[in-house]
Every structure is written in C-alpha cells, then in structure tokens.
C-alpha cells in the first residue's frame, strides 16, 4: 500500500470510528447501578448478575476508550503534513479551531447556563432573594467555562484519588482539554523533536501511574494521547503496520485486561485503577486496528449525516436543562415509567434503550437544526 492509499484509508477509518465513539460517550453517562464482581452479593448466573456485567462492561469499561481515541485522533490530524515547524501553519490551524472548538465550547456552556439561570430566577424567586441570585452569579464567574464541576476518578500509584473537573456542561471537559493541548502544540512539537520517543515514554509513565500535575485543562489523558498521535504523525509512523505485526499480542492482552477490568469495575476500585490505563491503551489499539481492517476489506462507511451529528450528540446528550436535568436522564425516567416492572430484565432493556433513544433524538434534532437554522447550527457546531 503506497502512502496516498494509506492516508486515505486512515482518514476513512477515523470517520468510521466517529459515530460509534459518540455512542460510547453516551454509554459512559448512562446510569448503571452496578459494582465490582468480587464484592457482589448476587449470583453471577442470574439476571441481576447479567445486568451488573452488562452495565460495567459498557458504561465503566469498553466505552472509556472513546475519549482517549478522540484525543489520539486529534493529535494525529493536527500534525498531518507537519514535518517541520511552521508558525504560519500553526496560526492557520489555531484560527480554524477558534471556530471549530472555542466558539462552540463557549456557546454550549453559556446557553444552558442562561437557561438554568432563567429557570432559577423564575421558579426559585419565591425561595431565593435577588441578593442570593447575585451571589450565585458572582461565585460562578469564570468557573462556568473552566471547573464548575469536579469529581474523583482513578486512584494513582501513591493511593491518592485523582480529581477531574469540567465546565457547566460537564462532558465538555474533553473540549476544554483539547483546546489547551492544541494551543500548546508548539511545546509538544519542540519536546517531540528534542526528546524523541523519551518524551512519549515519560508521558506514558505519567498516564499509567496517574502521577501528574493537577491543573484543569491539562489532564494526563489529553497530554499523553494527543502527544502520541502527534508523535506518530510527525514521524510518519505506519501504526497499522506495527499493530498488524503484533496483533496477536495486542488482541490477547486486550481480552485479558478486559476481563480483569470488568471484574474490578473499571477504574472504580483500587485494583481496577491499576489495570485501567493498560486496558485503555491495548483496547484502543485493538479497536483502531480492527476498524482499519474492516474499512479496508468491506468498504462500508457510516452515513455523512451520522458522522456530522457526532459533535451535537456529544455536546447535547448531557447538557443541563432547567427542570429536566438532561436529555439522557429524562429518557431514562420516561423508560422506567413505561416499563411494566423493575426486574433485572427490565433494567437491562432500559439500560440499552436509554442511550440508543438519546442518540436517535440527538440525530433528529441535529437534522432539524441544520435544515431550518443552518447559520445558527453552523456557529454551534463549528461549521461541521
């Protein structure tokens, strides 16, 4: 396969992965009342056991490869045809990201906040004085776009819980971190150029150990996978040739780590936190390789409408809505009300129906917006 064919196939593979990864992100935020199998007080071969395994597998383990892959692909694409540093090319790329990343990031945090504030003032005015509302606005300020929410994630090698943060529309922490690493590409390029693979090894150790600086916007996840993609792109590495050579090792290790991660509930236990980053690296590699093979052999592609709707699915599925919470939560509440019971079988059905209905509604709303409000949707979607 010559270089032009490889680049084209790589581009098709990336486009093929976008929609499944968007669905995976919705699964991450789909509620699953589950726990690790070691401490389980139910029979494994029961509907409760099946529901637990399904919930852990899809919401706590498999779906978590989506965000690292998005960062990896972003680094890969930023440095395509970027063999030597060019400030002119950098400014051009950053300028385009003002429209594709920064403006949508601001809008998708500001609009839900204003809606939330409106509901807070109209409905809560009887319970809250104007002074309380004023203090609420004052305390929010820049946190709205930076670190409005915070939550604990993995346990690092020193036994300390790693704290993540996100803006008002909390899934957009990915977009925030992507903006940061995109701006820092001159530094990333310099370190790759000077330290070579040592730079990637250092970031790999930081990612595996989760020993890292605590600065919102500079997560080790973003820095490692974005830089890895950049390194591969800058050095013209044929990642598929490498994965093909070691495919048996990658696949076998991925399956072993998948089993361990499901047993120990992903990153939600101390043991799970140790294996979790290893699983992410191997399973992401595995998915990327087999997606490449599938596209190459079948020539099947995801429809343009579904690919174009990925960004809308990502920003809207958990967007805070006054009174309702968010779309994903609203659909879950609705499904639980119409189901005949609350048995584990019902819960499995609701669990899968929830994200699928959420995605379907998001795609429908996206089509309506692009058809009737193309300029508005263009601004909100970064002209995607």
Regions found by a protein language model. Give the residues of each.
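Interfacial loop-to-helix transition and helix-capping segments at the boundaries
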Residues: 55-68, 161-177, 209-227, 262-286, ...
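Histidine-centered catalytic micro-motifs
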Residues: 25-32, 313-321
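Membrane-cytosol interface segments of multi-pass membrane proteins
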Residues: 1-203, 331-384
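Membrane-interface starts of transmembrane alpha-helices
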Residues: 17-20, 191-202, 213, 217, ...
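Structural signal for the C-terminal ends of transmembrane alpha-helices
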Residues: 78-86, 186-194, 228-240, 263-264, ...
